[in-house]
């Protein structure tokens, strides 16, 4: 049967599928657009499962903050071309909004949740794989919330608002002025993106990393042939420098070299006359 061009256009608008696929679907379904939609979905999902095994090395980081809670996630694609695709970007923004709503960091649980279209998150991703033509992989999710305070974030060099290749969210617990807290949290998020700390504080720094670094420094100092007491002081000094490199609260603030992050927070406490606790952060970098 001859397929009307307007029907092909309508089906394309509804599904995002190519002209040839739309024409084939309408021909197979006697011109019925609703049946053709289902046909495309069935055919597309079958193809999508084949594509879902392909390697992904690009993608986007997205953030969504809303008052006292926020989320950040990484969605990977095969190429930067797809990462710049408007449909892919819309999917990623919708996913991070839902991640903030559902407040789960479990990929397995999140994929089972309902997407805004009424399907599951998993099925929506598979549908987008079919339409876009590349594998799409939800790599990780990070969520933060506070009972009283703010969550804010930062994306470096965004492709559009809240989307880029590297980003961070920060949670501050305080009864202080929320607008001023948001400014502080964003400044800290910007610092995190630049300085890339390994941990919030020394007590939560990975012990294996800590022991490995101390062992490396000890071997270096042993070659100096210093007395034991002197050698120990040198080791402690170098470890202090290591902490300043990797522990957020000990890092020198990138916007003011006269302050550490801990001192920055204390200064803001004095200004607001309220206690401020930096309770957590999430830093995501594409494929890191």
From Swiss-Prot:
Residues 79-82 are annotated as: Involved in Mg(2+) ion dislocation from EF-Tu. The keyword Protein biosynthesis applies. Transmembrane segments: none annotated. The keyword Ligase does not apply. Keywords: Cytoplasm, Elongation factor, Protein biosynthesis. CDD domains: UBA_EF-Ts. It is found in: Cytoplasm. GO terms for cellular component: cytoplasm. Pfam families: EF_TS (PF00889). Belongs to the EF-Ts family. HAMAP family: EF_Ts (MF_00050). Associates with the EF-Tu.GDP complex and induces the exchange of GDP to GTP. It remains bound to the aminoacyl-tRNA.EF-Tu.GTP complex up to the GTP hydrolysis stage on the ribosome. PANTHER family: ELONGATION FACTOR TS, ELONGATION FACTOR TS, MITOCHONDRIAL. NCBIfam families: tsf. This is Elongation factor Ts.
